[in-house]
Swiss-Prot record:
Subcellular location(s) of the protein: Secreted; Nematocyst
Organism: Bunodosoma cangicum (Sea anemone)
InterPro entries: Anenome_toxin, Myo_ane_neurotoxin_sf
Listed GO MF terms: sodium channel regulator activity; toxin activity
Name this polypeptide is given: Delta-actitoxin-Bcg1c
Pfam families for the chain: Toxin_4
């Protein structure tokens, strides 16, 4: 999958730690949670 930035990764410009995985449809898989809050964002940023 494609890495995405969770809210807990912080708003840093350089050296972002992308700990989430991008899911475009259907929300996060079972056992995962959406780690990205509000804002203009396509899909879901999911984390185990």
């Amino acid at each position: 999958g494609v890495a995405c930035r969770c809210d807990s990764d912080g708003p840093t410009v350089h050296g972002d730690s992308l700990s989430g995985t991008l899911w475009l449809t259907g929300g996060c898989p079972s056992g995962w949670h959406n780690c990205r809050g509000s804002g203009p964002f396509i899909g879901y940023c999911c984390k185990k």
